[in-house]
């Protein structure tokens, strides 16, 4: 159904099916070998061998295909303080393992985007806190980014051919979880979840991409009027 939806938009939508040790892509080999850019946006949930699946997809394409992999800022170790692309990672995190697999296969034509928590159309983490009626570790900073800014970042990477890179993609606004989610709950659902204090948390910096690509985040994470239009919270 999703492939058909892409086709209606004038795109070449096709299905990828997978088994434990194999990948099947419903597209002719000669088409795969002539694709210039591959963007991998597959979440790790539901996979016991996520790194192998992602690696197998890459091997279906030619050795010149440029790759953008949407990773996660969740790969960083839990610390109190600022985090950059060079900070310590959780070595057994499935997404970090996938990063390593892709580097083995395509290091010079691969760019990794470590995305912060995504907000956008019908997607906002405040839903979880409203359901639980609790904001844990409320003094930790939020690390979020709007989906539209992620799309803009990908477009800029393709335009400027910024490959063999790793970037954090995260909005520079980092209020505390308490301040942000209390305001979000009131603005979007008239909720009032309880705040639970904790040990603090990491503040992920995205300045490397801003500096190297000349990128500016256009979509604020606290535009409640816009978020109210595109989300249902009750």
Please tell me what each predicted stretch does.
Residues 25-69, 97-101:
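NAD(P)-cofactor binding segment of oxidoreductase domains
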Residues 112-118, 125-127, 134-158:
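Substrate-positioning beta->alpha
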Residues 55-90:
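Conserved Rossmann-fold NAD(P)-dependent oxidoreductase catalytic core, especially the SDR/UDP-sugar
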Residues 83-102, 140-145, 174:
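Short-chain dehydrogenase/reductase
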Residues 100-121:
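Conserved beta-loop-beta element that borders a ligand/cofactor-binding pocket
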């Amino acid at each position: 159904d999703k492939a058909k939806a892409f086709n209606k938009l004038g795109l070449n939508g096709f299905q990828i099916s997978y088994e434990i040790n194999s990948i099947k892509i419903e597209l002719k080999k000669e088409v795969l070998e002539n694709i210039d850019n591959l963007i991998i946006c597959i979440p790790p949930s539901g996979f016991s061998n996520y790194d192998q699946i992602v690696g197998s997809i890459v091997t279906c394409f030619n050795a010149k295909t440029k790759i953008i992999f949407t990773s996660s800022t969740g790969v960083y170790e839990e610390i109190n303080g600022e985090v950059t692309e060079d900070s310590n990672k959780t070595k057994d995190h499935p997404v970090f393992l996938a990063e390593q697999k892709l580097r083995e296969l395509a290091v010079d034509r691969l760019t990794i985007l470590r995305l912060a928590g995504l907000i956008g159309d019908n997607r906002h983490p405040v839903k979880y806190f409203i359901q639980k009626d609790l904001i844990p570790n409320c003094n930790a900073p939020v690390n979020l980014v709007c989906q539209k800014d992620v799309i803009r970042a990908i477009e800029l990477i393709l335009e400027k051919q910024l490959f063999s890179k790793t970037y954090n993609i995260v909005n520079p606004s980092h209020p505390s979880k308490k301040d942000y989610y209390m305001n979000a709950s009131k603005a979007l659902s008239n909720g009032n979840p309880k705040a639970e204090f904790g040990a603090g948390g990491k503040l992920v910096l995205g300045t490397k991409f801003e500096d190297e690509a000349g990128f500016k985040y256009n979509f604020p994470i606290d535009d409640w009027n816009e978020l109210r239009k595109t989300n249902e919270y009750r």
